[in-house]
Structures are given as C-alpha cells and as structure tokens.
C-alpha cells in the first residue's frame, strides 16, 4: 500500500467524480461569484464487531492527501500543474504520507440504490461483512465540504460479529482499490481519536465519540 513511485501532478481535464463550476449570484444587492466542485453525495458506516470488541475501520492511500502533504512540506511543489503535461512531484515523500484511517465509505453514484443499500455494498466490498439494509441505524446526515463541494454525507451504524464476515474486504481490485481493514479495540478508541499524529478523517473522530457516548454505555462489555 505504501510503495508509491513516480508520483506526478497535472491538470484534471475530465473526471467522472467531480466538475469545477462557478456560481454567480447577487446577495443583498452585491454581485458575487463562488467556485465549487460538483461531486456525488456519500455514505459512511461505523461497524462495531462485538466478537472482537472493536470498531471496524479502513486504511488506504489517498492521492489528494499525499499531494497535499508534499505541498504543505515543500510549498510550491504543485505550481507546475499549469504546465502542458504532468510533472513529477519533487521531492517525493514516502507513501505513508498519504495513508489515512477512515470509516468504511462510498459514493452515492448508482441510480436506483437507497443510501442503506449503498452502505451495505461498501461494507461488503471494503470490510467483508454481509449486511442487510434493516441492520443499519442512521446516525446523522450532514453537509461536507461546504466551501468547496456542498455535498451531503450520511453515517450509519451497525453491530456485527465475526460470523458475518464472509469475505476478505479490501475493496474492488478492478477499480484500483487497495484497502486494509483495521480493528480498533474499544479500550484505546478514545486515545486513537484524540491522537493528532495518527492521520484520520473527521468521520472517525465523530464516529468514535458518538459510539462511546451513545452505544457503549448500553453494551455488556464484561
């Protein structure tokens, strides 16, 4: 996962996942404009494995995080994106600079599937757990990327056991996914969420906090 070679950055000419646009509008009599990205909504799933007394998370390499880290540590590294072709990122960082811990998640990009069905699909593909929509509890729906994308994300929760894991997870190879399943013991969950040196998403921090306050007190963890 962390063996990243030949990283280069260029212009995004076309993408099935995002499209840059500008909204022109008048507010309180003043003409304004705002650049944004049209993207898909998404779902996340917080899984608690009662057999292992652990939260089920995923870890994967995120190219955007990697490129952002290069620019953060070496300002100006992304300046070449306005050139004709992709330019190699220099200096290169180890692949670990782009690896993050996240909740199981996926885009809502398949017409006809409910949010629950998308969540079940992702839980199987990424983590190997077979779920039914009725297994899911909706935790919250919120806006993400309000300054850039304006997309919505819905978080679900479910309890699983080892018996429900009948697949390896790891994502879809044909889509280039390379995902590692991570089991986070409850005993260290809060410390994990609080540690600023562990690269993780806000969803993980929120999910751990929500679980420990709303679910854990009602569980028999003896």
Swiss-Prot record:
Family designation: Belongs to the Nudix hydrolase family.
One annotated GO molecular function: ADP-ribose diphosphatase activity
Q: Which InterPro entries match?
A: NDP_pyrophosphatase (IPR004385), NUDIX_hydrolase-like_dom_sf (IPR015797), NUDIX_hydrolase_dom (IPR000086)
**What GO terms describe the biological role, i.e. biological process, of this protein?**
nucleoside phosphate metabolic process; protein N-linked glycosylation via asparagine; ribose phosphate metabolic process
Alphabetical list of Gene3D superfamilies matching this protein: Nucleoside Triphosphate Pyrophosphohydrolase
- GO cellular-component terms in the record? cytosol
Q: Which PROSITE patterns match?
A: NUDIX (PS51462)
Oligomer and partners: Homodimer.
According to the entry, every stretch annotated as the Nudix hydrolase domain falls at 38-206
- What does UniProt list as this organism's lineage? Eukaryota, Metazoa, Chordata, Craniata, Vertebrata
Q: What coarse category fits the chief subcellular location reported for this protein?
A: cytoplasm
E.C. number, please? 3.6.1.45
* Description of pH dependence: Optimum pH is 8.0-9.5.
What species is this protein from?
A: Homo sapiens
Locations listed in the record: Cytoplasm
Q: Where is this motif: Nudix box?
A: 111-129
CDD domains referenced in this protein's UniProt entry, alphabetically = NUDIX_UGPPase_Nudt14
Keywords attached to this Swiss-Prot or TrEMBL record, sorted alphabetically, are: Cytoplasm, Hydrolase, Magnesium
Q: Which cofactor does it need?
A: Mg(2+)
Please give the catalytic activity noted in the UniProt record.
Answer: UDP-sugar + H2O = UMP + alpha-D-aldose 1-phosphate
> What is this protein's record name?
Uridine diphosphate glucose pyrophosphatase NUDT14
Instruction: Cite the PANTHER family for this sequence.
Output: UDP/ADP-SUGAR PYROPHOSPHATASE, URIDINE DIPHOSPHATE GLUCOSE PYROPHOSPHATASE NUDT14
The function of this protein is: Hydrolyzes UDP-glucose to glucose 1-phosphate and UMP and ADP-ribose to ribose 5-phosphate and AMP. The physiological substrate is probably UDP-glucose. Poor activity on other substrates such as ADP-glucose, CDP-glucose, GDP-glucose and GDP-mannose.
